[in-house]
C-alpha cells in the first residue's frame, strides 16, 4: 500500500505573521508539517530557533525554501553558491526531506554557470533532495490591467505572450536537466504553462508540489486551491494515483485578510482541498 502523502504549510502562508504562527496553525489545523521559508525574518534564519518551534508545537519541518527570492538576496550573505549549500545543511539539521530553490537570476552569471553541477554535487553528498522550482517571466501585458491580461491569455490559448525571463537558462527548470523538481501551481498560472503537461514532463523527478492556484494574472497570486483556473484537483489526483513519494505544501497568500478568523478559514479550506484530492 502506498503511503499517505504528507501535506505541509509554508511559513510564507501566514505572512506578515512570523514563522511561529505557521507552526501554531499547522498544529491547530492538522497539517503534517511546515516548509520553512528562509527570508528576512530573523527566526527563519536561525536553525536552532526553528528546531525549538518544531519541538514546542510538535510539528516537523518537511522542507526548506532557500533564500533565493529578490527580497532575500542578502539573507545568509550575498553569494548564492554558499547559500544553497547552507540551505542543504539546514535541511539536514531539521530532518527535512527537500530544499526548494529557484533557477538562478540571469545577472548571477557565475552561480548560473555552475548551478546544475552544484545541485548534483550537493545531492550526491546528502540525503536531501534539491527540487528546482518552475518560475514565470515578466509579462508585457501586466501593463494592461487584470481583466485585459486574463482575456489576452485566454485568447492566445495560454503562454505568457511577449515577456522577458530573468532566470537562467529559463524560468522552466526542465531546461536545466536536474534530478528533482518543485511544481508551483501559481507560477504555472502566471506563466500560462500547462500544469498537467508539466507534471508529465517532470515525471519521477517531481518530488515537491506547491499547492496553490492562480487566475492567469501577470502577477504571482498564490490563491487558495480551487479558487483559480489551474487544474489543481486533477494535479493532486494524478500524483495520488502515481508513485509520488514527495510532499505537498500549501503556499497560499493570506496577507490581505482582515482577521485571524479569515486566515484560519483559508488555511483550513486549503488543507481540506489537499486531503480530499490527494487521497489514496
From Swiss-Prot:
PANTHER family: HYDROXYPYRUVATE ISOMERASE (PTHR12110), PTHR12110:SF47. This is Uncharacterized protein ML2432. InterPro entries: IolE/XylAMocC-like, Xyl_isomerase-like_sf, Xyl_isomerase-like_TIM-brl. The keyword Signal applies. Residues 1-21 form the signal peptide. To M.tuberculosis Rv0498 and S.coelicolor SCO3347. Gene3D superfamilies: Divalent-metal-dependent TIM barrel enzymes (3.20.20.150). Keywords: Signal. SUPFAM superfamilies: Xylose isomerase-like. The keyword Transcription does not apply. It holds the Pfam family AP_endonuc_2.
